[in-house]
């Protein structure tokens, strides 16, 4: 099993798909990495030689931000927005949508489960 960027890649998958198991690498990025490493995207992970795996590691380490480093950078970007108290930072802090979506209805994914408010009883 190939281990790249701290992630065990599934042996039976094609290289193009296997690389997407790494956080920060999608299909397009995986194809770009394989092109730089001169590896056929249809090759199975189990069929990659040790040299090819090392070449993939080298390309990913040199050119791409993945896994923990990417997560850290995203967290720092959000923290910066919160610290400067811009609109987006305030929305992050309140747990509301950032990009202009309506919140009177919908927005449940961002706001979480409903918090019901009890009504006063009629006399």
UniProtKB/Swiss-Prot annotation:
Transmembrane annotation, as ranges? none
Q: Where is the composition biased (Basic residues)?
A: 101-123
Q: Which Gene3D superfamilies match?
A: 1.10.8.50, 30s ribosomal protein s13, domain 2
Which GO terms of type biological process are on file? translation
GO MF entry, a single one: structural constituent of ribosome
Which parts of this chain are annotated as the region Disordered?
95-123
InterPro entries named among the record's database cross-references: Rbsml_uS13_C, Ribosomal_uS13, Ribosomal_uS13-like_H2TH, Ribosomal_uS13_bac-type, Ribosomal_uS13_CS
Q: Which UniProt keywords apply?
A: Ribonucleoprotein, Ribosomal protein, RNA-binding, rRNA-binding, tRNA-binding
Gene Ontology CC terms: cytosol; small ribosomal subunit
Pfam families reported in the protein's UniProt record: Ribosomal_S13 (PF00416)
From what superkingdom does this record's organism come? Bacteria
Work out whether the entry's keyword set contains Nucleus.
Answer: no
Q: How does it assemble?
A: Part of the 30S ribosomal subunit. Forms a loose heterodimer with protein S19. Forms two bridges to the 50S subunit in the 70S ribosome.
Family, according to the entry, reads as follows: Belongs to the universal ribosomal protein uS13 family.
Function field: Located at the top of the head of the 30S subunit, it contacts several helices of the 16S rRNA. In the 70S ribosome it contacts the 23S rRNA (bridge B1a) and protein L5 of the 50S subunit (bridge B1b), connecting the 2 subunits; these bridges are implicated in subunit movement. Contacts the tRNAs in the A and P-sites.
Stated name of the protein: Small ribosomal subunit protein uS13
What is the organism field in this record?
Clostridioides difficile (strain 630)
């Amino acid at each position: 099993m190939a281990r790249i960027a701290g992630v065990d890649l599934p042996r039976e998958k094609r290289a193009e798909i296997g690389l997407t198991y790494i956080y920060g690498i999608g299909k397009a990025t995986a194809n770009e990495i394989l092109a730089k490493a001169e590896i056929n995207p249809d090759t199975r992970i189990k069929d990659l030689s040790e040299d090819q795996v090392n070449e993939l590691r080298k390309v990913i380490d040199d050119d791409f931000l993945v896994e923990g480093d990417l997560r850290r950078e995203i967290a720092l970007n959000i923290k910066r927005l919160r610290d400067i108290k811009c609109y987006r930072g305030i929305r992050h802090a309140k747990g509301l949508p950032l990009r202009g979506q309506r919140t009177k209805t919908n927005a449940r994914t961002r706001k979480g489960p409903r918090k019901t408010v009890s009504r006063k009883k009629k006399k």
